[in-house]
Structure formats: structure tokens, C-alpha cells
Design a protein with these regions (language model features):
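Short amphipathic alpha-helix that is part of the acyltransferase structural core
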Residues: 1-29, 129
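Conserved acetyl-CoA-binding loop-helix of GNAT-fold acetyltransferases
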Residues: 72, 78-91
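Acidic/histidine-enriched, beta-strand-rich ligand/metal-binding domains
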Residues: 77, 112-113
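Conserved GNAT acetyl-CoA-binding A-motif
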Residues: 93-107
Length: 137
């Protein structure tokens, strides 16, 4: 089966179980509230399982979006899932010209790895419009 990137609009019980493995520190109610607020949640699916996900807050009128909680399950890292998740998320929102991920979103012990990953995705480390440091494309 092929890896696909889906924009989730409703969470079924399987999605909730899988997102619990992606974001074990978060509660399903928070994901539902994120969606109900009109925000986007993209997930990488393989063999009917979610392997990674990212939340997106997009302001289409300004052509601007921020990425939140970008994560791939540890057991499936370094296999291209994250890169495909980012590339296809950007492709699915063509009205967005500026993409950002704040460094504060990433635990300090993972920043070096995330820096290499985000640069591989075409992002640069810089000062963001919010004034904090992070990656922008």
C-alpha cells in the first residue's frame, strides 16, 4: 500500500488511537478542538495507520501558515515519511506562500535533528514574523 497524506476533517476511533501514538502527551479533545476551530490537521497514512501528523494554522488571506506539533512516530522515522508529509501538506495548500515552524515547538534535545530535517525540506532557520527563532519557507 502507498503512503498518502490526508487532511483529516473528522477523527474516527482508529485515527484517535494512531494519533495517540504520534502525540502521546496530548488528549484527543485537543485535536478535535483544533479541527472545530477551522484549523487543518494533516496525517501520513500507510496500511490504514497514521505514522505522522502536523497541525496547520493558515491565514489564506495573508498567504501565511504556521506548522504545529510536527511529528513522525519514532519507529518509522528516517524513511521519508516526514519529508513527504511536509511536501504534500504544502502542495495541498497552494494559496500559502510563507510557512513557519517555531523552534519553541521542538524539544531542545531534538533541535539539531529538526534543523537538518527542516533544511532538507527547503526551510531556513531565521527570525520569524512573531519575533522568535524558527524555520521558514
Amino acid at each position: 500500500m502507498k503512503l498518502t497524506i490526508e487532511r483529516l476533517v473528522e477523527l474516527n476511533s482508529d485515527d484517535i488511537r494512531d494519533l495517540g501514538k504520534v502525540w502521546p502527551e496530548q488528549q484527543p479533545e485537543a485535536w478535535q478542538a483544533w479541527l472545530e476551530a477551522g484549523n487543518a490537521l494533516f496525517a501520513a497514512r500507510f496500511n490504514d495507520r497514521l505514522l505522522g501528523a502536523v497541525k496547520v494554522f493558515a491565514d489564506k488571506t495573508k498567504g501565511f501558515a504556521t506548522l504545529h506539533d510536527l511529528r513522525v512516530r519514532e519507529v518509522t522515522r528516517r524513511r521519508g515519511v516526514g519529508l513527504y508529509l511536509i511536501e504534500d501538506t504544502l502542495r495541498q495548500l497552494p494559496d500559502i506562500n510563507v510557512w513557519q515552524l517555531a523552534a519553541s515547538e521542538v524539544p531542545s534535545e531534538n533541535r539539531e535533528e529538526m534543523d537538518a530535517f527542516m533544511k532538507a525540506c527547503g526551510f531556513n532557520f531565521c527570525e520569524l514574523s512573531s519575533g522568535e527563532q524558527g524555520w521558514q519557507s
